Amino acid sequence: MCKIFTSRAFLVSVLGALALLAIGFMAANSTLSVSSIISAFFPHSLLSKPKTLRAQDLALPPLEIGDLVFRRGDSLESVIISQVSHHHYTHLGLVISADPLLIIHATTDDNPSTQNQVIISPLDEFLFHARSIAIKRLPLTNAQQESIALSARAEQGRAFVIAEGSAALYCTTFVESVLAPHIALNLVYDEVNLPTWSGKYLFPRVFFDMPKGRLIYERRL
């Protein structure tokens, strides 16, 4: 292999550029994920999976339906989203069952058999891609929690779409659409201006920083 590719800085810069191109490609209604596009160009040895959290290592408090679950992932896609949004967390899910603990989220490739759609993940599956996790509790009544769980489950299998406006369905817009009928959120979309990716998008940071709700747990590697 050419010596230049042994430089981590060079590799990160190349992967970063490719990731931005991939995100732009996905925004143009591609069915491919950023990770799959990058993997097609680089050997697995260069993209080896870093250490992630395990359920048995977490001292989670009892969770409730409607809890927001934030994740920083283990992929370059997560690094790019973190840089663009200026925030640690890059993915968002919603608890729809406390026992067993189930998290619903819109994702590209968490589960190889159900790519680019809204899926329901047990905690272990959600953590498989997590280097950090945080949980925020919203002020919800029991009736609101039950309604949220029902409406969220009805969305399972909907296609993941990076876009602007009503056509969008990615992790944060999915959670927004489920919660909005039950609780005032007042979320502000961020303007993105990059060569291959531009427009107004909703990042996990907005949910994390909003005054409504309280942080009940956080763990970072």
What are the roles of these predicted feature ranges?
Residues 1-6:
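N-terminal Lys/Arg-rich, disordered targeting/topogenic segments
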Residues 66-69, 124-126, 148-153:
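Short amphipathic alpha-helical segments, especially helix-boundary/capping motifs
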Residues 20-96:
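N-terminal accessory segments that precede or flank the first globular/catalytic domain
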Residues 7-14, 20-35, 162-221:
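Activation targets extended, charge/polar-rich intrinsically disordered C-terminal tails
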Residues 71-134, 160-169:
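Glycine-rich catalytic cores of cysteine/serine-nucleophile enzymes that process amide/ester linkages
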Residues 61, 116-119, 143:
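Lumenal/extracellular "mature" regions of secretory-pathway glycan-modifying transferases
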Residues 116-117, 146-153, 205-216:
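Short secondary-structure transition/capping segments
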